């Protein structure tokens, strides 16, 4: 009887195994540049290949025996099949993240984008549209396809900073569309883009190159109108023509009104049917009027989007500023507060010149040495190209920083991230780190990571064991003890998927209770961004803020259409801002409508502070969408007695029209009120903007600034709870604060700057340190003081802090501090890349 060859059996098994392993997900992870196979033809081919391999394997296993296979045939066959199977196993392991892909080091992305400019966000589409336009023109100069490609190319040229060329090609598209008698709606879309292009030309000249303190603040004042109004008048004409054919379009109405503002013809120059009256955006509450002084202080880097920290890095009693930018060739900027009303650039002195890029940054003290360290978050929005490592920068006693990412164990992983936050989740006295993973492909997400601090300068990644992998597209992270049980819970804001509320079980594990507590779903599309825990109504229970992010998709409308429609009272199908109030039993209810936050504003960066020292947290939102037509103001909401929020943007003079990202509150001049620093800039390589510092003029309300010093707990007191009892107008009230840096996109000072309203004495302050369980109470404290509370100490200490007058020039302003030039940046420029010898960084 002829026996079946064992070689054929093994070959059959290997073929079947190869058929299973070589699926489209594994092959995409192994071979595709974006780690995903999406073309239908390729998907069909892979499925057919899998079927052939599996059927061939079954045939070899089941075919009748026909004698032995010669070794010189069987051995090479088995080796080949083993190689194919091994490749399939490796590809599958890579897809499932069992094999970590190569991590990009800091200089790599800069070098890549310098040599291959098409790698920059939006640049590849410019090349693609140019090639398609050439193909369309080869057939006909005025075909419908040619018009479509010219319109699309105009948009991509704007993103690239080629504004004049964009205007020229859009004008050609308009003439061709008219000649072909294309539908009015299609002609109007070209007019709309021509209006945007003409406004962009003026925006670059007046808001960036000739930047002044009020040149970009909404509503544009008569003192800030453009000197060269040509672009504004051209834009008005296109917008008026659009509205004659399609009256009522919210985005075009909005842009027509803004164009009139910047030309100095608002409101009289706007047709009555299209006028957006000042009452639409006017403030109804009295509010201190800020002045923007960043440029005159030399702390306004002209950059792409990035993060910001306001804190005292050298422990001299004055708050410094650290800024990052998405540009992979520009280093962090460290502006030292000199204590005399001016700032010095300490970037080089602190050894930060090699720390380039960073969509977001935050401060920490991971080793409890009393020196603030910096964590840099990288790779956001870049999907698989964003597998570059973050950086943990340890501050040394001499004020320099050392990159300890690898030696700490944080450098072993790299996923794109925009949000990472610190807290002592296991109450062992040191700060742990949660890093939110982003989308890698259309169907694949990065795991989020929880790094437990080992107390010796190293970390262990424990997300899977703790139950917080998330596997969604994270855009915001917040730690806070929502149930007042003494341990830190975790809220995760996911873009396009339900959010998570991970309850800390007290045993180093978490349970997602978001759905049952009603804080997971944000209708209609679960698109949210920045988030935080705060006590919005001072009842001693932490509430949740999470900002809806209305972007292109879902409704099919661009950002400005949604935001403008909301301003005009028109219905929108988009996410609004949300606040979930804690009812004191650990449950939440959506109070967004009652508190007047149910509006579409599309913020990325956001944070909270107390601008009027009334003891209730206010909110500043930085509108950060990528589109050039998103000329909507950043927003300041004042908290009115914990009952509702009032939009006081125009009264406060803080409605910057350029794209905002990192937002940081802090008392920069030590005068007792919180100033606001906003990192400005977009994501497309020409969309650079000067950052802003809004100086608070103050009110008559009183305040207390508390510096926490942990002993058994983490040194900066992150997560510690502060309760003040004051008597205001003859009535006792409580004011609550929590140690930390505020929201998830921008970092406030760790010192707690607490307003106490009209109270002239603080009857009692209580500080609760959850890690140790220590509760300290002190009575009869003076107001308008800086104090230090050290964990376990018998008394507090008054700190001597000198108030200073910032040397800003107010409305006049001056030129922004020069920065390393960016791709297509205005003002004559160098693309990102290695700097010439002797060149100074950011």
Predicted feature locations:
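N-terminal alpha-helical interaction modules that lie
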Residues: 83-185, 189, 200-222, 226
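Blade-edge motifs of beta-propeller repeat domains
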Residues: 268-303, 335-356, 391-415, 447, ...
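Internal/C-terminal transmembrane anchor helices
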Residues: 67-89
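Hydrophobic beta-strand segments that make up the repeating blades of beta-propeller
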Residues: 308, 316, 320-325, 370, ...
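Gly/Ser/Thr/Pro-enriched helix-cap/hinge segments flanking short amphipathic alpha-helices
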Residues: 644-646, 650-659, 664, 668-835, ...
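Beta-propeller blade termini
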Residues: 305-315, 336, 358-371, 417-427, ...
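Short coil/linker segments at helix-helix boundaries
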Residues: 172-188, 196-241, 265-286, 560-563, ...
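Short, conserved, GDST-rich strand-edge loop motifs in beta-rich repeat architectures
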Residues: 204-227, 377-387, 436-444, 548-572, ...
């Amino acid at each position: 009887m002829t026996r079946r060859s064992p070689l054929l059996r093994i070959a059959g098994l290997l073929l079947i195994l190869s058929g299973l392993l070589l699926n489209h997900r594994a092959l995409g992870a192994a071979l595709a540049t974006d780690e995903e196979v999406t073309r239908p033809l390729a998907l069909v081919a892979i499925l057919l290949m899998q079927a052939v391999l599996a059927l061939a394997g079954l045939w070899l296993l089941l075919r009748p025996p026909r004698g032995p296979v010669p070794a010189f045939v069987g051995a090479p066959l088995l080796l080949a099949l083993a190689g194919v199977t091994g490749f399939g196993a490796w590809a599958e392991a890579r897809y499932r993240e069992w094999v970590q892909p190569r991590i990009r080091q800091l200089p790599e992305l800069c070098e890549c984008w310098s040599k291959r400019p098409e790698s920059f966000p939006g640049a590849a589409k410019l090349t693609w549209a140019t090639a398609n336009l050439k193909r369309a023109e080869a057939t006909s100069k005025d075909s419908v396809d040619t018009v479509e490609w010219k319109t699309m190319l105009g948009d991509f040229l704007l993103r690239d900073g080629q504004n004049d060329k964009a205007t020229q090609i859009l004008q050609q598209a308009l003439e061709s569309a008219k000649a072909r008698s294309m539908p009015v709606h299609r002609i109007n879309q070209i007019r709309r883009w021509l209006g945007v292009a003409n406004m962009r030309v003026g925006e670059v000249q007046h808001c960036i190159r000739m930047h002044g303190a009020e040149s970009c603040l909404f509503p544009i004042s008569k003192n800030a109108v453009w000197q060269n109004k040509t672009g504004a008048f051209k834009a008005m004409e296109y917008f008026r023509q659009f509205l004659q054919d399609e009256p009522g379009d919210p985005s075009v109405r909005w842009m027509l009104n803004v164009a009139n503002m910047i030309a100095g013809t608002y409101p009289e120059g706007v047709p009555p049917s299209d006028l957006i009256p000042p009452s639409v955006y006017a403030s109804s509450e009295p509010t201190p009027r800020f002045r923007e002084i960043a440029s005159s202080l030399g702390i306004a880097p002209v950059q792409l989007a990035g993060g910001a920290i306001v804190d005292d890095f050298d422990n001299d009693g004055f708050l410094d500023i650290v800024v990052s930018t998405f540009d992979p060739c520009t280093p962090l900027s460290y502006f030292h507060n000199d204590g005399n009303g001016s700032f010095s650039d300490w970037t080089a002195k602190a050894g930060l010149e090699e720390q380039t890029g960073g969509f977001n940054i935050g401060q920490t003290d991971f080793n409890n040495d009393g020196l603030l360290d910096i964590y840099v978050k990288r790779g956001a929005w870049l999907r698989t190209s964003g597998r570059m490592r973050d950086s943990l920068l340890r501050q040394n006693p001499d004020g320099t920083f050392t990159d300890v990412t690898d030696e700490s164990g944080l450098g072993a992983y790299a996923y794109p991230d925009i949000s990472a936050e610190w807290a002592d989740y296991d109450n062992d006295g040191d700060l742990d780190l949660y890093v939110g993973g982003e989308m890698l492909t259309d169907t694949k997400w990065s795991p989020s990571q929880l790094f437990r601090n080992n107390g010796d300068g190293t970390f262990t990644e424990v997300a899977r064991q703790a139950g917080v992998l998330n596997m969604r597209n994270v855009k915001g992270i917040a730690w806070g003890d929502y149930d007042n049980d003494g341990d830190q819970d975790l809220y995760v804001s996911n873009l396009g998927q339900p959010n998570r509320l991970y309850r800390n079980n007290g045993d180093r594990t978490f349970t997602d209770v978001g759905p049952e507590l009603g804080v997971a779903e944000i209708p209609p599309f679960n698109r949210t961004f920045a988030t935080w825990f705060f006590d919005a109504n001072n009842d001693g229970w932490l509430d949740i803020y999470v900002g809806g992010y209305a972007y292109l998709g879902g409704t099919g409308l661009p950002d400005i259409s949604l935001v403008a429609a909301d301003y005009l009272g028109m219905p929108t199908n988009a996410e609004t801002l949300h606040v979930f109030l804690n009812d004191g039993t650990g449950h939440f209810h959506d109070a967004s409508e009652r508190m007047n936050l149910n509006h579409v504003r599309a913020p990325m960066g956001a944070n909270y502070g107390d601008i009027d020292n009334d003891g209730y947290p206010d909110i500043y939102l930085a509108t950060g969408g990528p589109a050039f037509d998103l000329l909507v103001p950043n927003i300041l909401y004042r908290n009115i007695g914990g009952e509702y929020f009032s939009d006081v943007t125009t009264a406060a003079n803080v409605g910057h029209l350029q794209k905002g990202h990192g937002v940081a509150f802090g008392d920069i001049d030590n005068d007792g009120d919180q100033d606001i620093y906003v990192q400005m800039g977009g994501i497309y390589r020409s969309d650079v903007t000067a950052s802003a510092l809004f100086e608070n003029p103050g009110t008559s309300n009183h305040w207390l600034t508390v510096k926490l010093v942990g002993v058994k707990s983490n040194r900066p007191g992150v997560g510690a709870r502060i309760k003040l009892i004051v008597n205001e107008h003859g009535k006792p009230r409580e004011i609550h604060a929590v140690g930390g840096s505020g929201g998830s996109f921008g970092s406030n000072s760790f010192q707690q700057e607490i307003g106490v309203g009209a109270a002239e004495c603080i009857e009692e302050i209580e500080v609760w340190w959850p890690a140790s369980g220590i509760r300290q109470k002190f009575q009869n404290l003076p107001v308008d003081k800086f104090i230090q509370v050290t964990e376990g100490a018998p008394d507090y200490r008054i700190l001597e802090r000198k108030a200073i007058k910032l040397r800003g020039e107010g409305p006049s302003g001056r030129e922004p501090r020069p920065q390393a030039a960016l791709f297509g940046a205005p003002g004559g420029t160098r693309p990102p890349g290695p700097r010439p010898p002797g060149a100074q960084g950011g």
